[in-house]
Amino acid sequence: MPRNSDNPKVLLLCSMVLVMLVCCIPLAAQSKSSAPSTFPAADRIIDNYLKAIGGKKRALAVRDATSEWTIRLQDQVQGTARLQLKQPGAMRSEMTFGNGRIVSAATPRSAWAHGLTGPPRTLTGPEAAAAKLQAVLDAAHLVEYKKANIMARVLDLIESPLGPAYRVEFSTRSGGRLRYLFSVKSSLLIGIDDEARKTSSWFEDYRPEGNLLEPHTLRINLAGTGVLQLTLDRISYNGGLSASIFDPPRAAEALDVVALLREVSKNQDEVENRVNEYSFVQKETDREIDSKGVVKKETVRVSELYPIPNRRAVEKLISENGVPLTAERAAKEEKRVQEEFEKAEHDKDQDAKKAEDRKAERARKRSEGDDDEPGISRFLKVCEFISPRHERFQNRDSIVFDFRVKPGFKPANRQESLIAKLIGVIWIDPVDKQVMRLEARLAEGFKMAGGLLLSLRPGAALSMEQTRMSDGVWFPRFTEINLSVKVMLFGGGDINKTIEWSDYKHFSADVGGYKIGSPESSDPAKKKP
């Protein structure tokens, strides 16, 4: 593949990927009011909310909470509900009806849901991002949301069913987005709009519970079910909720995740050799996001890539920001690419020898007693695997599990220190022994030399997905990278990047057989003599 970050084997080992990165339905009746075009800052609105419910100190003192509710639909009792929250970012809701239960939960690692029918499923994409975002916000009553690398901006002032309200959008660079409504009159939170999960919620009848004001009426508009009214029966604080109640349900039988990961790792050399026989199209999208979560700039590059044995793939730029290269620039690009092929042909014996040396070195290390690749060995040493389970993903059976640092683990070096801060979830095809999807993020900030050399903020994240072709070969489909980094004394910045791969085409990867045609042709077969 063209770069280390595009290599399926490296993408499998989320620890190594992040080490590499270090180095290199809407709310009803929302009409806009005739209020002034300027609004209070998001921080001020949130501070006023915290004062209204009892103060920041009292809110932070609530380490966990359990509330019990009665569910009504059109004034008829339908069931009961339980909502559980635990700092720093865990949330579980359970609604029990006569015909079953609806359960959903989120932690910083993963989010999952179990409906009235079907098995539990691990959420992905915008659904998962929204669920994780809400868990972080609600578990701490919005206190110190910035420390979790969450952004906030005031969108507008609307006339809601509960009166004038400021609409504040909270977002993460990984795609989480929620809109909270705060009453202009009382400063209390009166609504949440979740477009990703097609849900809107209204909060009413605030009354004291312990040291805080809590809503005693909750109206939830779930897509396709109508409006459910929940009435608070009781709430308790700091009961010492176990973190395990937020974990996904595990499989009934024991699943050996360690053995499965070792098989996946050993399978990679053969898989990479097959992948290196394909050309493909790569689309890179880079976004500049400001401190309020607004995309200020987006650039898109589309290229064709041609793998070279034992060497980085040759990349041929096709377009930028949707515009094909001019004839003059295309000619220069073709000349540059042809020169790269010629150099690869000239160096192919040297490249082959280097590849053999690397292979021999790996064999030597394995003969000394370590049967694992270095990356997977560190990963297995540092991490434990939570709730291994069976799920359907991409219309195939998969084994899914969360991962986090082992309790009490003491890192011995910088790589282990970084891996120990990782959390996430992995989907594996148990038949083909391939990673189908991987999500990893930093639960804590990471610094080198006390932050003088490099500093990564919490929430730095990577997700990747592979897809299976009809001939059984697995290919990367996309990778998303989001992080805020500071490098030495040169400042830093935010990286928000998506790489998508498509149009895989098989051909012989012999350097001497390459001949590049015009940029308009996308058939690699036509580019050979």
Please place each PLM-identified region on the residue numbering.
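N-terminal secretory signal peptides that target proteins for export/translocation
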Residues: 1-11
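Bacterial N-terminal signal peptides
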Residues: 13-24
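Signal peptide processing junction and immediate N-terminal pro/mature segment
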Residues: 24-32
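Structured extracytoplasmic
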Residues: 31-164, 174-176, 240-241, 249-422, ...
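Beta-strand-dense domains in secreted/periplasmic systems and polymorphic toxin scaffolds
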Residues: 93, 192, 216-220, 438, ...
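Aromatic-rich beta-strand edge motifs centered on tyrosine
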Residues: 104-107, 158-159, 180-185, 200-211, ...
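Extended, hydrophobic interaction surfaces within ordered domains
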Residues: 117-120, 196-248
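A mid-sequence, solvent-exposed acidic-amphipathic segment
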Residues: 154-194
